[in-house]
Amino acid sequence: MKEKEIQENMNKSIEATQRNFNTIRTGRANASLLDRVSVDYYGAETPIKSLATISTIDSQTISIQPFDISCLQAIEKSISMSDLGITPNNDGKVIRINVPPLTEERRKEFCKLASKYAEEGKVALRNIRRDAVDKEKKDEKDGLISIDESRDNQSEIQKITDKYIALIETKLSEKEKEILKV
């Protein structure tokens, strides 16, 4: 694996981890909160953002305006059944969600969830590293590169991995601060 390819794969893992972090509720209303909620729309699981305009009215309220009014009940049901712990209010045209402030216990649960997502991201990075190191060892065994080149490349791969793991740790720290901020 080339260094550029390794970094591209690791960047994808970082982006996936960030998307997971974005779905964790903080004390503020955020449209990305609903990214993981999908609606059973004509027999197909469809993301809410494909069915409606989602906007934040203020720091505590999210507004969902469906493109097709007939899917209003389905959207409301999907939000109610999600693990977000929020209750939608349907006025017949728009769904409003009041995001209540988080309790201390709920904040700790979300911090644990953020840690879990960070760990999944680190595991993905380590898997990329393992694949790259295995390729280096195979190339060395096949005589395509020298032992010294292989060791240098493996050392470089480890440095890249350490850099990306530190980036995940930084993002986790930022997310935990955001969650714990009252």
From Swiss-Prot:
Top-level taxon: Bacteria
Key words of the record: Cytoplasm, Protein biosynthesis
Gene Ontology CC terms: cytoplasm
Primary location: cytoplasm
GO molecular function annotation: ribosomal large subunit binding
SUPFAM superfamilies: Ribosome recycling factor, RRF
PANTHER family cross-referenced by the UniProt entry: MITOCHONDRIAL RIBOSOME RECYCLING FACTOR PSEUDO 1 (PTHR20982:SF3), RIBOSOME RECYCLING FACTOR (PTHR20982)
Official protein name in the record: Ribosome-recycling factor
Species this chain originates from: Prochlorococcus marinus (strain MIT 9215)
Upper taxonomic lineage: Bacteria, Bacillati, Cyanobacteriota, Cyanophyceae, Synechococcales
